[in-house]
Amino acid sequence: LLGLVASAVLRCDDCIKYHLETSYKEGITKEEMMEAMGIATLVGGTIVIPHLRRAYEFWEALEESGQ
């Protein structure tokens, strides 16, 4: 999750997807992921919000595919 926060703050979409997929496979809950992204927004500011939206959409896709 720390990698996810750092990737969001640095606004690296490919990195965010990597950490989301890894977190999902490790059994991280949606609530834990959203808390981490909230911390990223706190650290990185509002510029992180578009990446938060894409991260949420990617997480939803992971849940739908059941990977």
Predicted regions and their residues:
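Hydrophobic alpha-helical segments
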Residues: 1-67
